[in-house]
Amino acid sequence: MTTKKSSYTYPIFTVRWLSIHALAVPTVFFLGAITAMQFIQR
């Protein structure tokens, strides 16, 4: 299992990590904002 492939896929800070967080953080923020707006209106 200890091959060059493991060292290639081991780093967490990759393009996939950036893309997931770039999409996840705004979605969580917008969902929280939408729910807060709905509770404030009522």
Swiss-Prot record:
Residues the record lists as binding heme: H21
Cofactor-binding details, from the entry: With its partner (PsbE) binds heme. PSII binds additional chlorophylls, carotenoids and specific lipids.
Cell compartment(s), UniProt: Plastid, Chloroplast thylakoid membrane
Cofactor or coenzyme needed: heme b
Protein's membrane topology: Single-pass membrane protein
Segments traversing the membrane: 17-33
Subunit field text: Heterodimer of an alpha subunit and a beta subunit. PSII is composed of 1 copy each of membrane proteins PsbA, PsbB, PsbC, PsbD, PsbE, PsbF, PsbH, PsbI, PsbJ, PsbK, PsbL, PsbM, PsbT, PsbX, PsbY, PsbZ, Psb30/Ycf12, at least 3 peripheral proteins of the oxygen-evolving complex and a large number of cofactors. It forms dimeric complexes.
Family label: Belongs to the PsbE/PsbF family.
Name under which the protein is recorded: Cytochrome b559 subunit beta
Organism of origin: Tupiella akineta
